[in-house]
């Protein structure tokens, strides 16, 4: 096909779309089902309606081929485990008794059965349920969900493309099941898994699928020759099947690298590449392999992970260079639109001119359709859209919101000394022990306590004008009083104020920092029914006034025990926001760090002896390729130290991280120079404690001893057993006892019981240690 004919054949498509509905109907229906207010039929009816509405909206917008199978009640990787029959033994009876309840039990656990481990989906803010596999795993085919959802779309008269997690990525994301040797490689199961995928593909073809999309984002990471050989074998086998649809292998989140020639040569009909994150590298690699003759190329030129309007002229130029490199060039976002909010048009509190800088899923869909039209019919066909887009880009570049000379002058004046603590850690630790007087194995929590219906009502009442600020603050003080009282009675050693005033650990600060915008309806799925509203970091950052000091000092006035000051760190402020793309991330991080440094200084001046600067996103924002990591870690750790570098030696700095594998960033954790770090560890059975020990980590650490993402209450013996496992790696004088993460999403009954058990377990193990 010539470049001209390839352009004429261009179509618009997307890989996936937000699941929740305009009013988060899916979240409400699922939680209603969990609480017994909705039955399974009502939940399924809601889900069917949401899928129908999404597909019809996409088709009406001009999307030629809508995705199916990307919808999920909880997680698409968990759906894949169900599809291939990889049900953990401890959950099989529940799944056999009731498939839906068993599905949710795998995701959330029950009082007696632990859930699957949950971790970040590559370097995004979405979480997936980690498959558990072993040498005895027997796969079986269950394509009912995939076939049914395809049938729903086809019944609407739409062209539909089922989306599956590819077999190589599925195995690379898996981990050894409990009781399986830690060095077991799930990829050794590929030959067992491929026949199941073959059956699924045959079922989908029989159901009417012309194309099936197989997502292989794991191939954008650094891969060994053995892993690349597995990818070659997988697609040689699947491509060689006779009873199958056409195959589109999709990669996203970065450049494809060494896997590109493997997939280019595979007997598949199409390849999807990310031209937002890895544009130059993917373009060069495509040219190096001679393009994709006879194949379909889906070009992800619209950024699927950020919310800024696309530079249409720049994207059209890139698309033009791709013509001639494939038999057909289609236009898409760089990844599933799951990672952005649904519709910017729903925002009412953002200035209209600023709103024109933003593109959520609906606007990105329009950009994709516009680009496909421009590619196929020429720029004259989209002249009006190009002119409007050009004006929006100029408006943003010239806006006073984006640049503050005072902020830029302060950032430029920072020195290396600003990012260093006063005194080496051993001296600081001695000063902190003398000041705090804590027992061995001190107990604490990560920060937040349950956000009750009463708290949400108070915020709603304030927004609606039913109460004034004084009335709202009175309610918050009452909640803080209850949280402090409970912690004292439970016997915790270092307390928190509970963050009752905070709707979200990033949004709370974003609302108080100049340069940020917040949304009303910009919800994005984090996991299951947990949705967040990432703020928009649009301009230079500064702090007009203290943000946390009044609440922290009020809490401290209620107790003689130390109360932690609680801040969100600069890297997490960036990672959990939609960040400006017009300057280097390191520069933006320094601006945020300096604003937070002012807050740290004010907390210390007010008498706060323990200050926690949370950085749960440090690991999850790590670039997917090793070559890109040193530069990231350099600015990320510097930003943390710039935040905390001004405190006295006897002020104890804590940090917290969750939901990640930490082995490859232990040196960076060390480089933060925090006095205490708490980490997620319960679901991974203290793996992180072992990783810290292997690195000879010299400071104090609190690997979590209970999983707060499940409603189950761990018993005293279970918690004590995890604590003893932690002691195998970390000396008692440096080990803290804490949950995995904050308690915001939990209910008060399970929170009380779990923390009381945590304190009892700490006392038990403390006594054992004293008697040994």
Swiss-Prot record:
L-methionine binds at residues 446-448, 499, 614. Residues 404-428 are annotated as: Disordered. Zn(2+) binds at residues 656, 658, 680, 741. It is an enzyme of class 2 (transferase). The keyword Metal-binding applies. L-homocysteine binds at residues 446-448, 499, 614. Binds 1 zinc ion per subunit. The keyword RNA-binding does not apply. Keywords: Amino-acid biosynthesis, Metal-binding, Methionine biosynthesis, Methyltransferase, Repeat, Transferase, Zinc. InterPro entries: Cbl-indep_Met_Synth_N, Cobalamin-indep_Met_synthase, Met_Synth_C/arc, UROD/MetE-like_sf. Its cofactor is Zn(2+). 5-methyltetrahydropteroyltri-L-glutamate binds at residues 24-27, 120, 576, 620. Pathway: Amino-acid biosynthesis; L-methionine biosynthesis via de novo pathway; L-methionine from L-homocysteine (MetE route): step 1/1. Its EC number is 2.1.1.14. The active site is at 709 (proton donor). One of its GO terms (molecular function) is 5-methyltetrahydropteroyltriglutamate-homocysteine S-methyltransferase activity. HAMAP family: Meth_synth. Catalyzes the transfer of a methyl group from 5-methyltetrahydrofolate to homocysteine resulting in methionine formation. Belongs to the vitamin-B12 independent methionine synthase family. This is 5-methyltetrahydropteroyltriglutamate--homocysteine methyltransferase.
């Amino acid at each position: 096909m010539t470049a001209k004919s390839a352009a004429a054949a261009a179509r618009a498509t997307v890989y996936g779309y937000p699941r929740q509905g305009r009013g988060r109907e899916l979240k409400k229906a699922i939680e209603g089902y969990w609480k017994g207010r909705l039955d399974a039929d009502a939940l399924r009816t809601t889900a069917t309606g949401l899928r129908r509405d999404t597909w019809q909206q996409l088709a009406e917008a001009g999307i030629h081929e809508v995705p199916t199978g990307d919808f999920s009640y909880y997680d698409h990787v968990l759906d894949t485990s169900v599809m291939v029959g990889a049900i953990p033994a401890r959950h099989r009876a529940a799944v056999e008794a009731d498939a839906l309840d068993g599905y949710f039990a795998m995701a959330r656990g029950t009082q007696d059965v632990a859930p699957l481990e949950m971790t970040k989906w590559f370097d995004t803010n979405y979480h997936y349920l980690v498959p558990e596999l072993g040498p005895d795993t027997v796969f079986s085919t269950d394509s009912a969900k995939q076939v049914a959802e395809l049938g729903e779309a086809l019944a609407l008269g739409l062209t539909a493309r089922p989306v599956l997690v590819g077999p190589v990525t599925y195995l690379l994301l898996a981990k050894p099941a409990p009781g399986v040797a830690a060095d077991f490689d799930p990829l050794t199961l590929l030959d067992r898994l491929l026949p199941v995928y073959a059956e699924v593909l045959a079922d989908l073809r029989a159901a009417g699928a012309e194309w099936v999309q197989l997502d292989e984002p794991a191939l954008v990471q650094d891969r060994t020759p053995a892993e690349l050989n597995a990818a070659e074998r997988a697609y040689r086998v699947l491509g060689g099947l006779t009873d199958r649809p056409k195959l589109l292998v999709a990669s996203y989140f970065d450049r494809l690298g060494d896997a590109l020639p493997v997939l280019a040569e595979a007997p598949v009909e199409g390849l999807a590449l990310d031209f937002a994150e890895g544009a130059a590298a993917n373009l060069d690699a495509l040219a190096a392999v001679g393009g994709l003759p006879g194949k379909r190329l889906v070009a992800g030129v619209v950024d699927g992970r950020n919310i800024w309007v696309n530079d249409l002229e720049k994207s059209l130029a890139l698309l033009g260079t791709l013509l001639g490199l494939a038999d057909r060039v289609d236009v898409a976002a760089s990844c599933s639109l799951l990672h952005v909010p649904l519709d910017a048009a729903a925002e009412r509190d953002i200035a209209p001119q600023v709103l024109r800088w933003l593109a959520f899923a609906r606007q990105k869909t329009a950009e994709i359709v516009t680009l496909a039209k421009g590619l196929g019919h020429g720029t004259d066909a989209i002249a009006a859209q190009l002119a409007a887009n050009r004006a929006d880009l100029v408006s943003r570049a010239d806006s006073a919101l984006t640049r503050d000379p005072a902020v830029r002058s302060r950032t430029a004046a920072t020195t290396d000394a600003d990012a260093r603590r006063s005194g080496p850690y051993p001296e600081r630790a001695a000063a902190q022990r003398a000041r705090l007087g804590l027992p061995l194995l001190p107990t604490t929590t990560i920060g937040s306590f349950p956000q009750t219906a009463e708290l949400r009502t108070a915020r709603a009442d304030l927004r609606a004008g039913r109460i004034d600020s004084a009335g709202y603050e009175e309610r918050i003080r009452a909640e803080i009083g209850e949280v402090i009282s409970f912690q004292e009675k439970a016997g915790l050693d270092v307390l928190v104020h509970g963050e009752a005033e905070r709707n979200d650990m990033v949004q709370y600060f974003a609302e108080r920092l100049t340069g940020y915008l917040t949304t009303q309806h910009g919800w994005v799925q984090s996991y299951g029914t947990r949705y967040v509203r990432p703020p928009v970091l649009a301009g230079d950052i500064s702090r007009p006034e203290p943000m946390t000091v009044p609440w922290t000092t009020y809490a401290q006035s209620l107790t003689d025990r130390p109360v932690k000051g609680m801040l969100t760190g600069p890297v997490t402020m960036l990672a959990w926001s939609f960040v400006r793309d017009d300057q280097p991330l390191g520069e933006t991080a320094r601006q945020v760090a300096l604003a937070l440094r002012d807050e740290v200084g004010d907390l210390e001046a007010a008498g706060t002896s323990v200050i926690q600067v949370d950085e749960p996103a440090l690991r999850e924002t790590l670039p997917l390729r090793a070559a890109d990591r040193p530069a990231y870690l350099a600015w990320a750790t510097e930003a943390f130290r710039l935040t905390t570098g001004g405190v006295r030696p006897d002020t104890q700095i804590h940090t917290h991280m969750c939901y990640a594998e930490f082995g490859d960033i232990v040196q960076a954790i060390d480089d933060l120079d925090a006095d205490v770090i708490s980490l997620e560890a319960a679901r991974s059975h203290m793996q992180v404690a072992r990783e810290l020990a292997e690195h000879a980590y010299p400071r104090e650490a609190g690997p979590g001893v209970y999983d707060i993402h499940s409603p189950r209450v761990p018993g005293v013996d279970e918690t004590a057993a995890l604590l003893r496992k932690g002691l195998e790696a970390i000396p008692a004088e440096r080990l803290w006892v804490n949950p995995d993460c904050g308690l915001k999403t939990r209910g008060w009954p399970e929170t009380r019981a779990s923390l009381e058990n945590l304190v009892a377990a700490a006392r038990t193990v403390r006594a054992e240690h004293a008697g040994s």
